[in-house]
């Protein structure tokens, strides 16, 4: 009996030892060995950043996210990575912005949560410029990039990259060969002031429709026209519901790579540099691939039987003359005239040129 009790006491002593400091030290030592010589277990613990965007897994936004993830894992030696949530899988666009603001999400690819980006997208019309000039101005060290970074900081966001700009083109089920044809359109609008003002001037009717419901609205003839980039027309399948495409160059669309400022501040200097390097790599990678992506989108659209039109210079000028003042007024009211002029100047519009475009 005494031998049995002795065995029980010995077993209890061994179990108690598992929670002792010596046992804990042994566990840490084991983790250090698994991590490898010359590094601590803490250093080998992978830090994962959460990234969200609203596009599909076949989109440029998702390709940018994947490029950033791959680069970050490589340059950090596997100590950092990115978890990607496409298709607003963490909630709607507003949910995503709320999550981004409260620190639930670390990175976001999409439009910035600032009213100034709307004005920047309309700069081809407002400043009589083109997307390549704007892209350069939004590059590292560019005047627009500096403004963009300043505006985003007010929302606790850091601009890490600006993805390629694309013109929004007109897609319709009524041929639009000239400005007057637009009067026959029931145009889908996206519900913001600039978009509504522009199309209400040009079209017979307008109707706000969420992009996720646009294909159905076209099928049911609630609307017979919409505008978007070539790649987005393909991504959302909208091109299958239209018969005509008319090229326009009054507005661009572009995504930005943004990071929550507090999350960035929580990283070490090395980690911050790795994240910035990964974002710059993603920006370069997508920019290099963009011409091919747009060409492939147009080929897919025309292969569907969609007919493409280009407006005459007279019609393009007429559209700009008819709409420019309304868009200027919209953003002057929203941002303030001084703020709008600052954006125009950053886009390379000199004061004299600005006055000229205002007169139309």
For each of these PLM feature ranges, what is it?
Residues 152-153:
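Soluble sensory domains of the PAS superfamily and closely related sensory modules
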Residues 14-17:
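C-terminal motif of bacterial Sec signal peptides marking the signal peptidase cleavage site
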Residues 1-8:
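Positively charged n-region of N-terminal signal peptides that target proteins for export
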Residues 131-149:
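A gly/proline- and charged-residue-enriched helix-loop-helix capping module
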Residues 19-130, 158-360:
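N-terminal secretory/targeting leader peptides
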């Amino acid at each position: 009996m005494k031998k049995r009790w002795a065995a029980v006491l010995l077993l209890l002593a061994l179990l108690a030892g598992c929670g002792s400091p010596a046992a804990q030290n042994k566990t840490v030592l084991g983790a250090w060995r698994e991590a490898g010589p010359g590094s601590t277990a803490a250093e080998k613990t992978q830090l994962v950043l959460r990234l969200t965007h609203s596009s599909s897994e076949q989109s440029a936004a998702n390709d940018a996210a994947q490029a950033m993830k791959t680069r970050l894992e490589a340059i950090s030696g596997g100590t950092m990575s990115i978890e990607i949530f496409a298709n607003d899988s963490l909630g709607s666009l507003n949910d995503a912005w709320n999550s981004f603001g409260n620190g639930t999400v670390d990175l976001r690819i999409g439009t910035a949560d600032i009213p100034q980006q709307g004005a920047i997208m309309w700069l081809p019309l407002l400043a009589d410029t083109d997307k390549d000039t704007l892209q350069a101005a939004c590059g590292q060290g560019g005047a627009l990039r500096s403004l963009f970074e300043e505006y985003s900081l007010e929302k606790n966001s850091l601009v890490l990259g600006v993805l390629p700009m694309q013109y929004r083109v007109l897609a319709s089920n009524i041929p639009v060969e000239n400005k007057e044809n637009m009067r026959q359109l029931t145009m889908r609008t996206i519900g913001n002031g600039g978009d509504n003002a522009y199309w209400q001037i040009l079209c017979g009717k307008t109707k706000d429709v969420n992009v996720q419901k646009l294909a159905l609205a076209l099928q049911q003839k609630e609307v017979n026209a919409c505008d978007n980039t070539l790649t987005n027309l393909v991504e959302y399948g909208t091109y299958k519901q239209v018969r005509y495409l008319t090229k326009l160059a009054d507005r661009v669309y572009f995504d930005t790579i943004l990071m929550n400022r507090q999350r960035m501040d929580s990283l070490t200097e090395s980690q911050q540099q790795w994240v910035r390097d990964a974002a710059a790599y993603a920006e370069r990678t997508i920019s290099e691939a963009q011409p091919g992506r747009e060409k492939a989108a147009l080929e897919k659209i025309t292969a569907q039987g969609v007919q493409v039109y280009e407006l005459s210079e007279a019609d393009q000028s007429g559209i700009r003359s008819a709409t420019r003042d309304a868009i200027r007024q919209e953003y002057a009211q929203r941002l303030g005239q001084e703020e709008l002029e600052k954006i125009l100047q950053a886009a390379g519009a000199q004061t004299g040129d600005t006055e000229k475009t205002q007169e139309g």
